[in-house]
């Protein structure tokens, strides 16, 4: 899974881009605490990182 696919899923679930710091896009959700930092652009994220990001977002 690449970062573009992760970002698409986050945005569909209501996560909003808060800021960009270097090569990381930081997303926050209006109803959920915390934030999620996605390395972008990155062609392939490791399976563990992709699953961790989706779990943090409540999508898995």
Located regions from the model:
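C-terminal structural segments of small proteins and small subunits
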Residues: 4, 8, 12-13, 26-60
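Short secondary-structure junctions
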Residues: 14-19
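Cytochrome P450 catalytic-core helices
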Residues: 22
């Amino acid at each position: 899974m690449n970062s573009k696919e992760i970002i698409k899923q986050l945005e569909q679930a209501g996560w909003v881009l808060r800021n960009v710091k270097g090569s990381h896009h930081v997303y926050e959700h209006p109803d959920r605490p915390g934030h999620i930092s996605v390395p972008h652009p990155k062609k392939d994220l490791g399976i563990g990182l992709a699953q961790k990001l989706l779990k943090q977002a409540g999508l898995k």
